[in-house]
């Protein structure tokens, strides 16, 4: 937090010395919307398609992880000068609170996506390696994990992996953008209606897949950012780590548990997430013969995905193709 306070002060000094011309800024003639991660950036692009007076800026550059992101002075200036700032509101956005507290008026122009939907806290996943497993190897009662202290509850950030949440967020953002630019409200609403139809079609696709599933449990040899998707379509899940935990080495007990789970249920695929080194999944696959497949949390695009301008819908349909194999759908 000391580093962030320094950057906020530095941003203020730079703005005074050289002005803010190099940073997109809100003005009477245009609207600047800033997001931390990719999904709301893409939603806003869909809502404002065809509007020449809207600039959308995503702070997280392609290939970067949101959980290790540190804002630059230019990022701070963009947040302080924008008309609307959209962030997730989970653990990886802790820096946002400090920035908003130090930026008069910024909080009123900001929205947390976890406040727009029924967000859940990171779950205790059977067999997964939790922080407690490293910090308290000999702790006695596993039930303590099921009721964590309220001071340590962490939202599962990946709310957009459920298309229903994507629809709710898109509708809410449309309303906010319409209030910023009433003259173009009809355009924004028409765009939103068209996009909601596409999201509904994605939902139909996922429902169809899960209804035909031969297997109903997904095993992630990795972190687990797909809680909302699994809950939405009634899928069970096991993973090496909950949410996007900071841990990178699973316990021996976790590895044994996942290997036995795959063998017992004859699960055909071990799943990983984007930007993973796949080491854990490979170790499980070596023991079970299951294939390794990758799913995408959509929190950010890789440099290649950004270069081809893949959308949220593109990435989610790729996830659907992976699910077809992982769930044993034959049609």
Model-flagged regions — what are they?
Residues 4-23:
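Sec-dependent N-terminal signal peptides of Gram-positive bacterial secreted proteins and lipoproteins
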Residues 20-331:
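Extracytoplasmic metal-acquisition and chelation regions
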């Amino acid at each position: 937090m000391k580093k962030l306070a320094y950057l906020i002060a530095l941003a203020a000094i730079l703005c005074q010395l050289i002005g803010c011309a190099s940073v997109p800024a809100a003005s009477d003639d245009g609207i600047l919307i800033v997001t931390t991660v990719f999904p709301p950036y893409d939603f806003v692009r869909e809502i404002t398609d065809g509007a020449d007076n809207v600039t959308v800026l995503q702070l997280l550059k392609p290939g970067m992880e949101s959980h290790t992101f540190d804002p630059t002075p230019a990022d701070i200036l963009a947040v302080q000068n924008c008309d609307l700032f959209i962030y997730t509101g989970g653990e990886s956005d802790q820096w946002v609170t400090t920035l908003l507290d130090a930026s008069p008026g910024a909080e009123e122009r900001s929205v947390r996506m976890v406040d727009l939907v029924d967000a859940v806290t990171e779950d205790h996943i059977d067999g997964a390696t939790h922080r407690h497993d490293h910090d308290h190897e000999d702790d006695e009662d596993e039930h303590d994990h099921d009721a964590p202290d309220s001071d340590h509850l962490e939202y599962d950030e990946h709310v957009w992996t459920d298309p229903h949440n994507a629809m709710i967020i898109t509708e809410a953002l449309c309303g906010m953008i319409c209030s910023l630019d009433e003259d173009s409200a009809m355009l924004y609403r028409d765009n939103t209606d068209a996009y909601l139809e596409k999201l509904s079609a994605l939902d139909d696709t996922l429902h169809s897949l899960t209804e035909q599933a031969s297997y109903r449990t997904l095993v992630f040899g990795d972190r687990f950012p797909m809680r909302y998707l699994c809950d939405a379509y009634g899928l069970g899940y096991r993973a090496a780590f909950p949410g996007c935990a900071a841990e990178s080495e699973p316990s021996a007990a976790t590895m044994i548990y996942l290997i036995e789970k795959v063998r017992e249920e004859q699960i055909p695929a071990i799943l990983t997430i984007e930007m993973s080194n796949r080491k854990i999944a490979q170790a499980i696959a070596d023991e079970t013969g299951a294939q390794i497949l990758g799913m995408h949390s959509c929190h950010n695009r890789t440099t290649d995905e950004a270069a081809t301008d893949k959308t949220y819908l593109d990435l989610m349909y790729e996830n659907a193709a992976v699910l077809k194999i992982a769930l044993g759908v034959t049609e």
